[in-house]
Curated annotation (Swiss-Prot):
Iron among keywords: yes
NCBIfam families given in the database record: Oxoac_fdxbeta_Archa, PorB_KorB
Transcription is among the record's keywords: no
Coiled coil: none
Catalytic reactions on record: a 2-oxocarboxylate + 2 oxidized [2Fe-2S]-[ferredoxin] + CoA = an acyl-CoA + 2 reduced [2Fe-2S]-[ferredoxin] + CO2 + H(+)
Keyword terms, alphabetized: Iron, Iron-sulfur, Magnesium, Metal-binding, Oxidoreductase, Thiamine pyrophosphate
Protein species of origin: Aeropyrum pernix (strain ATCC 700893 / DSM 11879 / JCM 9820 / NBRC 100138 / K1)
Cofactor: how and how many bound: Binds 1 [4Fe-4S] cluster per subunit.
Positions that bind thiamine diphosphate: 49-52, 68, 94-95, 125-126
Binding site for Mg(2+): 93, 121, 123
Record's protein name: 2-oxoacid:ferredoxin oxidoreductase 2, subunit beta
Amino acid sequence: MARSWLDYKTQAWVQWCPGCGDFGILNSIYRAVSELGIDPENLAVVGGIGCSGRTTYYVKGSNFHALHGRAIPVATGVKLANPHLNVIVAGGDGDLMGIGGGHFVALGRRNLNITVLLFDNAVYGLTKGQAAPTLPAWVKTKALSMPNIHDNINPVLLAFAAGYTFIARGYAYHTQQLKELIKTAVRHRGAALVDILQPCPTYNNIMTNKWYEERIYYVDQEEGYDPIIRTPEEFQKKAPAIAAKLMEFGDRIPLGILYWNQTRESFEERLEKIMPGYMSAPPATRRIELEGKPFLHPFDIFKDRLVTP
């Protein structure tokens, strides 16, 4: 049953710069989870450090504001403890592609049922506009004293190589389309990435709204491109075209669902195979004490090594 988006709005004051793409992303999240009818008690938003991390304060749920780059491992623990929760990671390109890059890759390899929303503005907005991992080489934004000399990371291509089974790209100012992408990502069974391009009006004076609008287009309007993998055999056939589309970034930037593998089993399904009953009785629902005493008492582990006076 659909809910009102107001059911997910907290009383916290939203602290972002005027015109920030984060507003569009937040509104898209509100509407996506409300149209999916997700109870706030069954929603967990995990964020890292950066402007994007504040999302955890603005959406009602069992949320967690993690350390820099550590949103994905925290979300992994949340999801494994209670696989019935809808877990969303909200992180910036610096947080998830920089210090958190290793965790980003690990999530794809596991294919755990978590949705990653990558707030991608190519700068570190919270710390005065340094170059983030997604800023192309030789671009000089107004906060930089000289052009960026690092090559940029391509988040969607990295996700494809790591094993994510749903990869999409949206634009923060196109809230209707972004809402639909988030809904599909949350419904997907497995690791999902939505790379959300957004202007940073305060620090990125190059990749502005005008810059993006001149380049972005939606792949579903392009005849002949089918990103959906329905059988294992289809992957071998479609992988080259999908990889080429994921590499496309410059004069033309594709938006929409770029890759969707519906054949690979999720990490939870694999756990169920080696731990029968995991899904029906996950760790979060199991008793941790009996008659006031814990099931596992640490003294029992070390009783043969205890030194008594």
